[in-house]
Amino acid sequence: MKTWLFFTFLFSCSSFYASCRYAEVRSIHEVAGDILYDEENFWLILDLDDTLLQGGEALSHSIWKSKAIQGLQKQGTPEQEAWEAVVPFWIEIQEMGTVQPIESAIFLLIEKIQKQGKTTFVYTERPKTAKDLTLKQLHMLNVSLEDTAPQPQAPLPKNLLYTSGILFSGDYHKGPGLDLFLEICTPLPAKIIYIDNQKENVLRIGDLCQKYGIAYFGITYKAQELHPPIYFDNIAQVQYNYSKKLLSNEAAALLLRHQMHE
């Protein structure tokens, strides 16, 4: 039995005669063969933050963004308002920060799938205002999706942006943006393979595929858990206090130690 079976949870379902399969993995190696040797006409769709890349500082990391949104919600701010308040600042911090890949093997997988001529693109909850930042970050990681991305047959709603193989939805929860995208794509794929670090997103896209009668392989991707942590509350606070010029985690830690000894 393959090693990856110990780390995956698989099951099948049917809706409109479309198969549905789920897996949870800690390395893309665990499902790479299933994807590479899948003979169906599939689209490979990938999440961005914490799936392909992550911020290199505590304040630029998505964990800070999530905690800030949750903090506002605890104070009574509605979810969408909290999202709209936090994300623009987080994007500004990302502009000043560094970016790290989650797992180099996933980029090799993307390259091999593209060489097969299979459709590949990114679906991110980032707003369309993050276009330039996102393209720069992917360029730094030598990722290009434009040549193998699908081409919609009609204009998207104004809240969405699709460019260079990246669908920017501005969704706090995944699903609605891709739904609108699928509505204007012809023909639809026989199958969608979706990779995201959040299980709830993987399940939502599975429900969406059932709606369209599209076969589905949803992969909850936990490779980030194998990395040393980047986010620390106290480091993020120091970086926030000096956010006009984003400090590295190391510089923030030195400053924090100095403050503690004063």
UniProtKB/Swiss-Prot annotation:
Segment forming the signal sequence: 1-17
Topology with respect to the bilayer: Peripheral membrane protein
Stored InterPro entries: DUF2608, HAD-like_sf
Primary localization class, coarse: membrane
Keywords attached to this entry: Cell outer membrane, Membrane, Signal
UniProt-annotated location(s): Cell outer membrane
Any one GO CC term of the record: cell outer membrane
Sequence intervals crossing the membrane: none
Name of the protein described by the UniProt record: Putative outer membrane protein CPn_1034/CP_0818/CPj1034/CpB1074
Organism: Chlamydia pneumoniae (Chlamydophila pneumoniae)
